[in-house]
Amino acid sequence: MTMLAEPTPSDAARQVTAAWKQLSRTRRLYSWLGFGLLFLALCGSLWFADDSNAGHFFDRLPHLFDFVSWLIPSDWNDVWRALLDIASPHDNGTEQFNFPLGRVYVWGDFYIPEYVELMIITINVALVSTIIGFCGAMCLCFIAARNMTPFHWLRVIVKRVMEFLRAFPEIVIAGLFAAILSIGPLAAIIAISLHCIGALGKLFYEVIENIDMKPDEGLKAVGANWITRVRFGGLPQVMPNFMSYVLLRLEINVRASTIIGAVGGGGIGQELKLSISRGFGAKTLALVLLLFVTIYAVDQFSAWLRRRLVGEQAFLLQGVGK
């Protein structure tokens, strides 16, 4: 009887190498195919854009950076004068260089620059909206979680409500409420808060559904009610993650409140839109720089605070459980 020779280690290695090379060639082929389809889709979208703009899309491409050249002022010092509401030597009697026009006098000759006040309003809108969104999400998330809900039929309703709240962009909701409540920060607060409840609620209940259920089972065994089980069995495990998500949402809401200001939500976004529409280059650049510095500072601070919260998770769990 003829015995079949068993494959040697070198034969097995060659087979693995050949299979790996074949897989690499297949992946490379799929990658090039994907890039080709993406390139065709890009060309098709450019053709559609040119056709939709009556053939002027490609004609206007050389003027793509005209806005940047308009934004750069002839005198760079006017940017700082506009930011601090200091008189400009180029003042010609119009609002373009009349920077002290927006001063907000607090006491005597002490004033807050107009754009700084508007930036504070924008941050306050984001902060208040985040707090309202956090409170609303906290009220709904444990009901929406599969492992903690007291009534499963109520869980379905709550999840649908949160899906509805986050289905519409903040700017759409803000435009609706601005038409109802008039222009101002109130419309922005309502719009961002509603969207924040839906977004944070989804993140929160997904965290809750992955907690360790042993503490909850122990509390249930001694006859604890649902609120007590949530307080001592659920919250200690999820609060660090909740705080991390809230701080991340605060970063998003600062940017959202700026954008919403352009549709009547007040704050610095509304002033930025007016400066661009009126052709005030120095004021526009001052607002852009202030926005960049502020959003960068908020992002860095919230990222640092998130790292501290997640790093001290054991300490927070111990403090909440007491």
Model segments located where?
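Generic hydrophobic transmembrane alpha-helix motif, especially the helices
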Residues: 159-193
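Hydrophobic positions within alpha-helical transmembrane segments of bacterial inner-membrane proteins
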Residues: 126, 130-138, 142, 146, ...
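A structural signal for multi-pass alpha-helical bundles of membrane permease subunits
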Residues: 44-51, 174-181, 296
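N-terminal, non-cleaved signal-anchor transmembrane helix
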Residues: 1-131, 143, 147, 310-322
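Membrane-cytosol interface at the C-terminal ends of specific transmembrane alpha-helices
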Residues: 159, 184-234, 240-249, 300-303
